[in-house]
Amino acid sequence: DTSTGSASVDWHATAVTLTITPSATSSKILVSFDGQVYVQNTSGDAGIALKISRTIGSTTTSPDALHTKSAANYSAHYTQQTYGQFAFRAPLSGLDSPNTTSEITYKLYFIPYNVNGAGINSMNGRSTLTLMEIDGS
């Protein structure tokens, strides 16, 4: 359960993480997240964006294929004019090309906007992160 009490300009790390070691440098990794997100607000629009980072050794990156925020685009967004507290599914998947046979750790992050509270797996939610190696030769 990861949550924050306010809107932010920073990405929040979650406990949703998984590791895989590809068998070939040409392998692709299908990364698939399906989970419950939570947002709460007292007025106006509110939303949440997701991204999955990739760590190989000591280098962490956020591949474009695993990112839902582009300018004002958020993966899960709702509009409301009065107090609201909502939990809903927010899937994210992408095909990564890490070009390595070293261990890779994928980790979910979120960033909320215009909220009093937001999080992943709040309100008894569950999330899954699935990694599948695909032959890239």
Predicted regions and their residues:
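Terminal beta-strand-rich extracellular "head" domains
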Residues: 1-6, 10, 21-103, 107-137
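Short, solvent-exposed loop/turn segments enriched in Ser/Thr/Gly
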Residues: 12-14
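Extended, low-complexity regulatory regions
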Residues: 16-18
